[in-house]
From Swiss-Prot:
Natural source organism: Saccharomyces cerevisiae (strain ATCC 204508 / S288c) (Baker's yeast)
UniProt keyword annotations, A-Z: Carboxypeptidase, Disulfide bond, Glycoprotein, Hydrolase, Protease, Signal, Vacuole, Zymogen
Family: Belongs to the peptidase S10 family.
Other known facts: Present with 44000 molecules/cell in log phase SD medium.
The protein's name in its UniProt record: Carboxypeptidase Y
Propeptide: 21-111
pH dependence statement: Optimum pH is 6.5. Active from pH 4.5 to pH 8.5.
Active site per the UniProt annotation: 257, 449, 508
Length: 532
């Protein structure tokens, strides 16, 4: 069995999860495990009340967690270790320091990159970097903005968010959709299909302690808490750069993976502020985790030959996944009903053991079912090149980074979100609210991804309740022809302002696998009336 570590929509699993089969065996619960967990979660616990509230399925799962990992609960860490800066730059080191009396305790520090040729990344494009500071909580979020190559005074703006939770959006910049990738010699390689071809793109490292972001505190461990920070970042950003929005330019949020959690919540937070200084025009969610209760039905079909690729698992493994599914879904339902850490944590651990670990143990790439995991950093050795590039002193100096060491993903953040119960929560309900407010939404999915696969994404969009759900469900899937390549590049289903797109030959990171078609998708969406 090949040993490696991978993100599962961000979750770091190890090969110790090979014990998953024993989760089928009922065990007695030592009540101390709940008391210990409560202490670690920082929760007051009325044990007798809790035992009455939790159903037997959830209690059995806690018992099995204790049985499989007897030392884990006692040693459990549920907060991020502080990430301290190498050196705080003084006010005079920044071109702009932006505050707003209506947003207490927040400020934005901004620098224009004086000579982009030093970095070799889109040298003819204006670039800004900086930090959002949450002063009373000692949180500092890093961002990097690239103006449109076309007409920044008129083109729309896109905020890009990578998932994880805990992965830097600079991964999106250098690995997927930004102006350059990084070669093995640590030299930038220009990307003709960058999303800033026709839009200004902001890459934001969030939540705190991700990428070049940092905090002297433990940061956040759930999606809702992160939403306020992102909204305030945008308010201050557009205070400083009103030229990006004051002529009626559109603003969009796009992201992938765990951003299927982030984006619905962040968009809801934005729309709740009627006096905001920018207009949220649409959102785009790529290979996201949004409705686990629906999506977890589709790991076995995707792994076992029903997603368009041959099965990667033997029949007995497929049968074991089928056998464990009913219990997995029952645990997710309990999480949906209570949205309590006590129900949601065991749902995540049990279901990821039962539905995801069998595939991972094969050594295949969870982000692309056609490939083996190449080892190294998250199955793609190129990600290590990105880390090495960003850790060079001249790069950190040029972008104003205050953190000594950059890492593409912070697995502590991932763990914190899991143990806050965030993973299995029903964020698709926020999508319902957004659609009912007439916000255009594009859900796209590369069809070679396993971990947030197209089968599950199509399924949840098909059953999502909203004001035109019957009309959407009745629409036929049709071919989508990409404008740049003029080839049939996917299948699309759309009604009014809701669109689902299956992207052929794309993995988890669609812009990495099919860059021309990804840019076609974005251009057609943001410049073509929010339909494909």
């Amino acid at each position: 069995m090949k040993a490696f570590t991978s993100l599962l929509c961000g979750l770091g699993l190890s090969t110790t999860l090979a014990k998953a089969i024993s989760l089928q065996r009922p065990l007695g619960l030592d009540k101390d495990v709940l008391l210990q967990a409560a202490e670690k979660f920082g929760l007051d616990l009325d044990l007798d009340h809790l035992l009455k509230e939790l159903d037997s399925n959830v209690l059995d799962a806690w018992a099995q967690i204790e049985h499989l990992y007897p030392n884990q609960v006692m040693s459990l860490e549920t907060s991020t270790k502080p990430k301290f800066p190498e050196a705080i730059k003084t006010k005079k080191d920044w071109d702009f320091v932006v505050k707003n009396d209506a947003i207490e305790n927040y400020q934005l520090r901004v620098n224009k990159i004086k000579d982009p040729k030093i970095l070799g990344i889109d040298p003819n494009v204006t670039q800004y970097t900086g930090y959002l500071d949450v002063e009373d909580e000692d949180k500092h979020f890093f961002f990097w903005t690239f103006e449109s190559r076309n007409d920044p005074a008129k083109d729309p703006v896109i905020l890009w968010l990578n998932g994880g939770p805990g992965c830097s959006s600079l991964t999106g910049l250098f690995f997927e959709l930004g102006p350059s990738s990084i070669g093995p010699d640590l030299k930038p390689i220009g990307n003709p299909y960058s999303w800033n071809s026709n839009a200004t793109v902001i890459f934001l490292d969030q939540p705190v302690n991700v990428g070049f972001s940092y905090s002297g505190s433990s940061g956040v461990s759930n999606t809702v808490a992160a939403g306020k920070d992102v909204y305030n970042f945008l308010e201050l950003f557009f205070d400083q750069f009103p030229e990006y929005v004051n002529k009626g330019q559109d603003f969009h949020i796009a992201g992938e993976s765990y951003a299927g959690h982030y984006i619905p919540v962040f968009a809801s937070e934005i729309l709740s502020h009627k006096d905001r200084n920018f207009n949220l025009t649409s959102v785009l969610i790529g290979n996201g985790l949004t409705d686990p209760l629906t999506q977890y039905n589709y790991y076995e079909p995707m792994a076992c030959g029903e997603g368009g690729e041959p099965s990667v698992l033997p029949s007995e493994e497929c049968s074991a996944m089928e056998d464990s599914l009913e219990r997995c879904l029952g645990l997710i339902e309990s999480c949906y009903d209570s949205q309590s850490v006590w129900s949601c944590v065991p749902a995540t651990i049990y279901c990821n053991n039962a539905q995801l670990a069998p595939y991972q143990r094969t050594g295949r790439n969870v982000y692309d079912i056609r490939k083996d995991c190449e080892g190294g950093n998250l199955c793609y050795p190129t990600l290590q090149d990105i880390d090495d590039y960003l850790n060079q002193d001249y790069v950190k100096e040029a972008v104003g980074a205050e953190v000594d060491h950059y890492e593409s993903c912070n697995f502590d953040i991932n763990r914190n979100f899991l143990f806050a119960g965030d993973w299995m929560k029903p964020y698709h309900t926020a999508v319902t609210d957004l659609l009912n407010q007439d916000l255009p939404i594009l859900v796209y999915a590369g069809d070679k991804d396993f971990i947030c696969n197209w089968l599950g994404n199509k399924a949840w969009t098909d059953v999502l309740p909203w004001k035109y759900d019957e009309e959407f469900a009745s629409q036929k899937v049709r071919n989508w022809t990409a404008s740049i390549t003029d080839e049939v590049a996917g299948e699309v289903k759309s009604y009014k302002h809701f669109t689902y797109l299956r992207v052929f030959n794309g993995g988890h990171m669609v812009p990495f696998d099919v860059p021309e078609n990804a840019l076609s998708m974005v251009n057609e969406w943001i410049h073509g009336g929010f339909s494909l």
